Amino acid sequence: MWPRHKVEAMTDQAEQASAAQSTAPEIPGKPTSASRTTLSHIMTHSDTNLLGTVHGGVIMKLVDDAAGAVAGRHSGGPAVTASMDEMAFLEPVRVGDLVHVKAQVNWTGRSSMEVGVRVLAERWNESAPATQVGSAYLVFAAVDADGKPRTVPPVLPETEKDKRRYQEAQIRRTHRLARRRAIMELRERRVAEGYED
């Protein structure tokens, strides 16, 4: 995990670079299916919390692993987690469940990507189809060998569902930037009024 201040700085750089017009040559786009992946894992006793269900942190690690693989595959190199939005735990996961973590790139900026993740569980003692137990949206920044943002290929939504996900990702990005701007303005006002944070 990267230090928070470094991730925030990289996120800021990636978001600013995404908003700016690029003079670099255009990189060919990649369809959503090119990086879509599924990571599967059987949950064991070592994954449980005090209640006997799988610890949320274990699920979050699987989510980050799958999303990181997708971001690296799409960008063609290293990508670091910049933020995680809306991690939702819908149902408990139990020991013995076969968990499938499905991830794909929903949106790309100049050097950042949103990866959408769905978590499904097949109950070991039931013959029912897999149940959705969680979901999350993560933002990754593609980086070069020096840790500086690098350009990523644009994602090319293929289906109507992919197009909807792309549009929803744009809304989340707009909200994320507005929230960050509002917080910075509040902090600046407080400093101007003489408050120490």
List where the protein language model places each region.
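A conserved, well-ordered hydrophobic junction motif at loop->secondary-structure transitions
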Residues: 48-62, 195-197
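HotDog/MaoC-like acyl-thioester-processing domains
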Residues: 2, 6-21, 26-27, 34, ...
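Extended boundary segments
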Residues: 32, 36-53
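N-terminal leader/targeting segments and the first structural element of proteins
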Residues: 40, 44, 73-74, 88
